[in-house]
């Protein structure tokens, strides 16, 4: 039997979706299908062709096509969902939730129809609630529907720590628990630089400031851009997760997954440390938490639940 490349579909060809597609192609993780709505079919095809024409220069082998027809995504191994609207000025979070939930339901229906055996990674915000929506709508087992936020939040945390210590980001490890928002829980106790606990290297007030900046990391970029939100780091985070699955790397990465009793919570999607490999979420890693950390996680969970209440 002929060996075939993996097929990865990216739903939503905006800044994040297009950047994700480009990174996945550069990493040669598979052939890429970039999908958007019919009104945007030509720009989507244009972006895909532009990326493809960079392949001789950058030296990667991957086919990249743009489309508005989900039939082109048939038999995808992995589907990444970035589609959805961004929150506009004056728009309530509830409005954002209901609009994006409708989009998730439509997208999921098409994905399941054409790629019933795929793994789905969700980026659309509010990501905890949207991951839950896709999980319920797809009927897929929980290991195959994964939300991305922790890799991004941890990347921001690691960036700020590396800047503070003036060291390589490669030497900084960290973990962020909970929902993707102001109540996320960066676990400083489980964070290191070159194997040394951060608490031994950075004064508490500076560490607290880094935690606070991490929580507000998305907002900081929104404010600086003035229009739109972050897309380079979110796309890089998605690419890292896709690579872990495609190459069966069994990486320890924070991911949003469906909890069934872990950390004392049940029936909800929340960011926790996981092992991510060829079978999607292979395992949830349960860390021992202090009372303060438990309280912070409970607060984060409440924020997620408040969003979930809006779901139809």
From Swiss-Prot:
Gene3D superfamilies recorded: Lactate dehydrogenase/glycoside hydrolase, family 4, C-terminal, NAD(P)-binding Rossmann-like Domain
Binding positions for NAD(+) per the UniProt entry: 12-17, 36, 100, 123-125
Keyword Phosphoprotein assigned: yes
Residues that bind substrate: 87, 93, 125, 156
Record family assignment: Belongs to the LDH/MDH superfamily. MDH type 3 family.
Any GO MF annotation of the entry: L-lactate dehydrogenase activity
EC number: 1.1.1.37
Lineage of producing organism: Bacteria, Bacillati, Bacillota, Bacilli, Bacillales
InterPro entries xref list: L-lactate/malate_DH, Lactate/malate_DH_C, Lactate/malate_DH_N, Lactate_DH/Glyco_Ohase_4_C, Malate_DH_type3, NAD(P)-bd_dom_sf
Disulfide cross-links: none
KW Manganese (keyword) present: no
Record field: catalytic activity: (S)-malate + NAD(+) = oxaloacetate + NADH + H(+)
NCBIfam families tied to this protein: MalateDH_bact (TIGR01763), PRK06223.1 (NF004863)
Entry annotation: catalytic residues: 180
An individual GO BP term: tricarboxylic acid cycle
Protein name: Malate dehydrogenase
Function in brief: Catalyzes the reversible oxidation of malate to oxaloacetate.
Alphabetized UniProt keyword annotations: NAD, Oxidoreductase, Phosphoprotein, Tricarboxylic acid cycle
Positions bearing Phosphoserine: 149
Species name: Geobacillus thermodenitrificans
């Amino acid at each position: 039997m002929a060996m075939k490349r993996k097929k990865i579909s990216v739903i939503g060809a905006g800044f994040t979706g297009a950047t994700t597609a480009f990174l996945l192609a550069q990493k040669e993780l598979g052939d890429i299908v970039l999908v958007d709505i019919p009104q945007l079919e030509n720009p989507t095809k244009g972006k895909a062709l532009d990326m493809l024409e960079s392949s001789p220069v950058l030296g990667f082998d991957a086919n990249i096509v743009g489309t508005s027809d989900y039939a082109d995504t048939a038999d995808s191994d992995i589907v990444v969902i970035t589609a959805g609207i961004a929150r506009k000025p004056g728009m309530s979070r509830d409005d954002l939730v209901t609009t994006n939930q409708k989009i998730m339901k439509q997208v999921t229906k098409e994905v399941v129809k054409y790629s019933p055996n795929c793994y789905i990674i969700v980026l659309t915000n509010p990501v905890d609630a949207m991951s839950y929506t896709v999980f319920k709508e797809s009927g897929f087992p929980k290991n195959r529907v994964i939300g991305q936020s922790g890799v991004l939040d941890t990347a921001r945390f690691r960036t700020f720590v590396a800047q503070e210590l003036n060291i390589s980001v490669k030497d900084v490890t960290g973990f962020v628990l909970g929902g993707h928002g102001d109540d996320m829980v960066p676990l400083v106790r489980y964070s290191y630089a070159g194997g040394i606990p951060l608490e031994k290297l950075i004064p508490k007030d500076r560490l607290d400031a880094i935690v606070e900046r991490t929580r507000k990391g998305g907002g900081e970029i929104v404010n600086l851009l003035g229009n739109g939100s972050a897309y380079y780091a979110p796309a890089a985070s998605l690419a890292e997760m896709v690579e872990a699955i495609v190459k069966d790397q069994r990486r320890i990465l924070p991911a949003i997954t469906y909890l069934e009793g872990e950390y004392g919570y049940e029936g909800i999607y929340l960011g926790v440390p996981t092992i991510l490999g060829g079978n999607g979420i292979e395992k949830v890693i349960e860390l021992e938490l202090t009372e303060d950390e438990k309280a912070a996680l409970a607060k984060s969970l409440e924020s997620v639940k408040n969003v979930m209440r809006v779901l139809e």
